[in-house]
Every structure is written in C-alpha cells, then in structure tokens.
Design a protein with these regions (language model features):
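Phosphate-coordination/substrate-recognition cap region in phosphate-metabolizing enzymes
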Residues: 1-31
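Conserved histidine-centered catalytic loops in small-molecule metabolism enzymes
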Residues: 1-4, 32-35, 112-141
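Short, active-site-adjacent cap segments at secondary-structure transitions
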Residues: 7-8, 82-84
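Glycine-rich phosphate-binding loop signature in dinucleotide/nucleotide-binding domains
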Residues: 63-72
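Short, conserved phosphate/pyrophosphate- and ester-handling motifs at nucleotide-, phospho-/glycolipid
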Residues: 79
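Active-site signature of alpha/beta-hydrolase-fold catalytic machinery across serine-
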Residues: 85-89
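Domain-level recognition of soluble alpha/beta enzyme cores
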Residues: 93-121
C-alpha cells in the first residue's frame, strides 16, 4: 500500500449526500469538485486537486525510475479521482480545469502503461474485460 495513490481526501465533505431527498445543503460547493474543478475549495482537512496531482505524480515518477522494476509487470489499483490524476500525470495534463476532460475510468477498467527509459506511455486505456453492462459515470456541467 502506498498512501500517495489513495483516493482524494474530501475532509468534512467525506460521506456527504450530494443528491436526492437527503442532499446536504453544502453539497453545491462540494459538487464543484466534479463540475467546476478549478474553483473547488476543500474544507476542513480536504485536499486540493493540485495536491492530488502532486502526490500521484511523485508515486508515478518513483515507480517509473525504479530500475528493479524495469523488466517486471506491476499492477496499480486505486479509485476514480486518484486514477484520473495518475493518467493526467502520464498525459502531462496539469490543467485543473481539464482534470475530468477524459471522464472517470470505468469500474475495474484496465489501462496498460509501458515504461521506457523512465517515461510512461499509455498502450491501452480504460479497457473493460467483463460482459455485464455497467452504467458510465460521467463528470460534466
């Protein structure tokens, strides 16, 4: 386990109901994380998107530069925002406003990355290996 690839910390927003009858009145501010990411301001110990990008980027850099792993297959698993941050780091998309540009990887989706000379390259992205229909989770305004 590596804490650098844990899901983003939402602070006081953790567990907040953001829809339906029990929707929290403060959920509008929290919803900016999904629809207006550059204006999302975390509260009470929450983490910013740049902080998430930095820690996942450090993990990725260390992984790619580890010579002991150069001829090995490595499995990395995490949650949606952290995985999106990892993919954005690989694609060098550091624009917070475009954080969700490619959506959220589907549940259990597989992305294959090849590392050559310390540089990661996406070979296949968001491949699904199960047959059951799963609702796509989209982020957008």
């Amino acid at each position: 386990e590596d804490k650098r690839i844990q899901e983003i910390c939402f602070g006081a927003y953790e567990g907040m109901c953001i829809g339906g009858e029990k929707m929290d009145p403060k959920s509008g501010e929290f919803n900016k994380f999904f629809v207006d990411t550059e204006n999302y301001v975390p509260i009470d110990g929450g983490e910013t998107v740049p902080q998430l990008m930095k820690r996942t980027g450090e993990f990725l850099r260390e992984l790619c530069e580890n010579k002991e792993l150069s001829q090995k297959n490595v499995l990395v698993t995490t949650h949606g925002a952290a995985m999106t941050a990892l993919l954005n780091n690989i694609k060098e998309n550091f624009d917070v406003a475009a954080f969700w540009k490619n959506g959220v990887p589907a549940n259990c989706a597989v992305t294959i990355v090849d590392v050559k000379e310390g540089k990661p390259e996406i070979i296949k992205e968001n491949v699904i290996y199960y047959k059951e229909q799963v609702r796509t989770w989209k982020v957008g305004k």
